[in-house]
A protein has these predicted regions:
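C-terminal beta-strand edge segments of enzyme domains
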Residues: 1-76
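A conserved beta-strand->alpha-helix junction
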Residues: 20-22, 49-65, 125-130, 134-175, ...
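Short acidic-aromatic active-site loops that bind/stabilize oxyanions
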Residues: 70-82, 176-183
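Phosphate/ATP-binding catalytic cores across multiple sugar-kinase/actin-like superfamilies
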Residues: 79-101, 187-193
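Conserved helix-loop functional segments at active or binding sites
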Residues: 89-98, 119, 123-126, 166-169, ...
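ATP-dependent adenylation/pyrophosphate-handling site
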Residues: 98-104, 108-145
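Residue-level signal for inorganic ion chemistry
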Residues: 107, 148, 202
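Active-site adenylate/phosphate-handling loop in enzymes that bind or generate adenylated species
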Residues: 151, 172-235
């Protein structure tokens, strides 16, 4: 962004995109010819020789400055989305990852994170995993599949029922403890895929959930990066 003395916008590059902005400035005429600023009349001696070559004694003719491009400003919500995409892309690349993996529940948060990941590093590098339990509705499972089809990400289904049952056969858990066990089975699954294939696990929680602790430690809170960690649910 380049702003003039009168606060007018002289040039603005596209936001959150690689590019180069060049601005020609219509500057006032230079001062009368004289010694460079800071130069004195003292004579200096040194063990080197300076040769000056004059290519032309004619002054360069002035030219009309070319107007710089002023890219339109992204609306607030679009700006937040672009910032989140850029942040995820930079984090993945600068930490040496080639791909990401996340759980797809059929809900809005995981759908948004999956879309952000596809825009950031390409759908071919995004792995979405549906991990249904005996309590999962057909609607949530079909929504996860449809999201994968629409975005083009790599999709797999890993039922967690047998994992949960193995725990419950050995530990008596009910109510909230059993519900959290399902979330933790999903977390273990994602971390296992990460260790096996080198994916970065993305957590899908948003700022509102993290602020009030609405998540399961070692469960849906698992992950190396949470794209929505600074995005409130209300946005």
């Amino acid at each position: 962004l380049v702003v003039g003395a009168d606060e007018a916008v002289l040039g603005r590059a596209p936001q959150f995109e690689d590019g180069c902005l060049t601005v020609d400035l219509d500057l006032p005429a230079a001062m009368a010819a004289g010694p460079p600023l800071g130069e004195t009349s003292h004579e200096y001696t040194a063990d080197y020789l300076v040769r000056r070559s004059v290519l032309s004694t004619e002054s360069l003719a002035p030219y009309t400055p070319e107007p710089a491009g002023v890219a339109p400003r992204i609306p607030d919500q679009g700006e937040v989305y672009a910032a989140v995409v850029t942040g995820l892309r930079d984090y993945v690349r600068k930490n040496g990852f080639q791909s990401v993996v996340l759980g797809l529940s059929g809900g809005i948060d995981s759908a948004l994170v999956a879309t952000i990941a596809c825009d950031a590093i390409g759908a071919q590098n995004v792995y979405g995993v549906s991990m249904p339990s005996s309590y999962s509705s057909e609607h949530s499972k079909s929504d996860a599949r449809e999201l994968a089809e629409r975005t083009g990400l790599r999709f797999a289904t890993v039922p967690i029922g047998p994992m949960v049952r193995a725990f419950l056969d050995n530990i008596e858990l009910t109510g909230l403890a059993e519900e959290n066990l399902q979330a933790r089975a999903r977390g273990v699954t994602l971390m296992g895929l990460s260790n096996q294939y080198g994916h970065l696990v993305l957590a899908t929680g948003n700022k509102s959930e993290l602020a009030v602790g609405y998540s399961t430690i070692y469960g849906d809170a698992v992950g190396g990066y949470a794209p929505l960690k600074d995005v409130p649910k209300t946005l």
